[in-house]
Amino acid sequence: MARRHVVRAAVSVAAAATSLIVAAPASAAPGVGSPGLGDPYFPLAGNGGYDVRHYSLDLDYVRATNHLDASAVITARATQDLRRFDLDLRGFTVSRVTVNLLPATFTREGQELVITPRVPLRRGKTFFVKVEYRGEPTEVIDPDGSSEGWVPTADGAFVVNEPQGSPGWFPANDNPRDKATYDMAITVPKGITAIGNGRLLSRRDHGGRTTWRWYEDSPMASYLTTATNGVFELRISKAGRIPLYHAVDPTEVPDGAFERLAAEAEVIKFFSDLYGQYPFSSGGGVVDHAPEVGYALESQTKSQYDSTPDPSTVVHEISHQWFGDSVSLTVWPDIWLNEGFATFSEWIYDEKHGGPTAQASFDQVYARPATNSIWTRPPGNVGGPQFLFTGTVYDRGAATLQALRVKVGDKTFFRILREWYAHNRDGNVTTADFVRLAERRSGQRLGAFFDTWLYQPAKPTTW
């Protein structure tokens, strides 16, 4: 994510990760899935007792009334015997729920949709949930005061979800640990373009409306989904064999939005050479006119820009496809694994393209006085969800990587980054995982180094 215009931050406590799988003894009666997964910042986000494999979303949106008529079919595997389980959903009127084609009873408890299937679910078995719902999608206000979820625009909606916006428009197991594949059918008035994740399968006009079908075949965290829609010019090109979908609001065309997005092909090649093969089967970006949002987001395969981005923002968001989207955090306090890596990627891109070296960028950060918040609020322990996206996770996070580069040498450092991606592609990680890899590949004990850079509320002086 590009830096927000409001204050935010992140705390990295790898030990706080709780298990997604909670298995009941074989002899026990079917249990109840937990209403949250215990994330240190968002303890009720996500749900226990099952693992989602696929979401099939059918969304029919009318901007004039800001009304969404929708259904979600969720394919999941039970990780314990279940007589009841939850999904995360904000607002809406839920009209019907079925589990394995049988009507299920359901209640609403805050943002929990509590479902009781007619027949209990057995551990290890695949099951299917269909939720039919309608109403006004939710624009979620974050702890830092910024907007996410389904944010209405003049002609549609800008749909971005980090960290907790997706339940504002579809029922989800809203925790980054439970990745799944997705297909979306987004129906909008004719003349409106709807952009989902992955590849465009079809576009069909019918009765004054248009249905856009998208499919993302790589596992994706729920916060990385999108269904942005509005009046856009859509252009399709390629980066090698990878289709790129670029959608731009007409008001942003004169500012060079298409030219900025066209750079994605070269950026993808650069990071593919540096880190490893591009993670996904498609790519692209959306430039909307949504100045009230105030940030860009690395939605998987379709970076979302609230206005025409500068070149460094494009580089930042594309690098997130490796670090953040494919290699994803396990708990939100480890957000520096996303933003620090993407900011360092900006630095190394500049270094290799005639700009400042990464060391020069490090020096600029390090020149900040000891009273600066990046030193007093370390990226591995920033104090709460309201600080998730403050400068420390970006700048001090990136500085941590550059300091590691100097400490272990270029050959070892870039081997660490390549292995980090290769070994964790489509998966979830913690800071502790990265420390172990860095120590193993460098042959050095790095606990004190990472403690100094990530967890101490003071400017590092020796490391």
Predicted regions and their residues:
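N-terminal, polar/Ser/Thr-rich
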Residues: 3-5, 18-22, 27-69, 152-155, ...
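Glycine/proline-rich low-complexity spacer/linker segments in large multi-domain proteins
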Residues: 123, 132-182, 232
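Hydrophobic helix-coil surface modules that form long, contiguous segments used
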Residues: 70, 172-315, 344
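Amphipathic alpha-helical substructures
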Residues: 357, 390-463
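N-terminal export and membrane-targeting signals
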Residues: 1-14
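Zinc-dependent metallopeptidase catalytic helix centered on the HExxH motif
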Residues: 177, 301-362
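Surface-exposed beta-strand/loop patches in extracellular or lumenal glycoproteins
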Residues: 69-92, 172-174, 182-189, 432-435
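A surface-exposed beta-strand-loop module
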Residues: 89-151
